[in-house]
Amino acid sequence: MATTGEALNASEYIQHHLTNAKMCSTDGGVAFNHACQDAGFWTWHIDSLLFSVGLGVLFLWLFYKTGQKATAGVPGKLQCFVEMCVEGVDKIAKESFHGKNVVIAPLALTIFIWVFLMNFMDLIPVDFIPEAANRFLGVPYLKVVPTTDLNVTLGLSLSVFVLIVFYSIKAKGIGGFTKELTLQPFNHWSLIPVNFILESVTLIAKPISLALRLFGNLYAGELIFILIALMPWWAQFALSVPWAIFHILIIVLQAFIFMMLTIVYLSMAHEEH
């Protein structure tokens, strides 16, 4: 797929598929894509926003409608799937979270399904939606997998980080949270600076590792799909099907890991020392 009608070489093709649709504000107006190269931090990846919010709304609508139509008799396939997800995540939350908080199970379910749906977009053929958007809407760049955008995974993990800090302060108080940062692992006033550095690094590493793990796995998977798409048609079929089947495991596993680590981190935040 080319942005101006000419064929792209392999390097340009890869770069094209790894470029987000951007929007920014310049000189009081709105600019897109290449015009946003110097906009810096204030650049919106509108494709990531569109697909992540859209998939979040789809998740809420789907589960809400299923709940409205739930019957006591023989459930349909969709109701069975929703009930399996809800009951499974609820069981995991009860086994992994050792405090008392009614928010944890719904939060874990939301994270798992939302991240799973965003990851699932990676199974759509790499040229299918971008080519349609370019041909019919004139959109030259489009990344359809939100979790291949570090901004999305960092946004998710920073939200978890805020909850970790909030519940740590709520459970221990400001004084207890401060002591946790300054008097562990060495309980002596002279080692407060060392403790603070060690505990701060440990705390900050949680959202960073969450974000990079999810981003790295999905970005690598998307890159492999792009490389397969550059091959002859017979090689594409021979390689894309096995990789897609294997990638289903990665999609589910990464959503599960993100959910589990969120539960574990919040459980640790509720513990009183």
From Swiss-Prot:
PROSITE patterns: ATPASE_A. It is found in: Cell inner membrane. Keywords: ATP synthesis, Cell inner membrane, Cell membrane, CF(0), Hydrogen ion transport, Ion transport, Membrane, Transmembrane, Transmembrane helix, Transport. The chain crosses the membrane at residues 44-64, 104-124, 149-169, 223-243, 244-264. InterPro entries: ATP_syn_F0_a_bact/chloroplast, ATP_synth_F0_asu, ATP_synth_F0_asu_AS, F0_ATP_A_sf. GO terms for biological process: proton motive force-driven plasma membrane ATP synthesis. The keyword Cell inner membrane applies. It comes from the Bacteria. The keyword Transmembrane applies. GO terms for molecular function: proton-transporting ATP synthase activity, rotational mechanism. Its main location: membrane. It is a multi-pass membrane protein. GO terms for cellular component: plasma membrane; proton-transporting ATP synthase complex. Coiled coil: none annotated. NCBIfam families: ATP_synt_6_or_A (TIGR01131), PRK05815.1-1 (NF004477). Key component of the proton channel; it plays a direct role in the translocation of protons across the membrane. F-type ATPases have 2 components, CF(1) - the catalytic core - and CF(0) - the membrane proton channel. CF(1) has five subunits: alpha(3), beta(3), gamma(1), delta(1), epsilon(1). CF(0) has three main subunits: a(1), b(2) and c(9-12). The alpha and beta chains form an alternating ring which encloses part of the gamma chain. CF(1) is attached to CF(0) by a central stalk formed by the gamma and epsilon chains, while a peripheral stalk is formed by the delta and b chains. Belongs to the ATPase A chain family. This is ATP synthase subunit a.
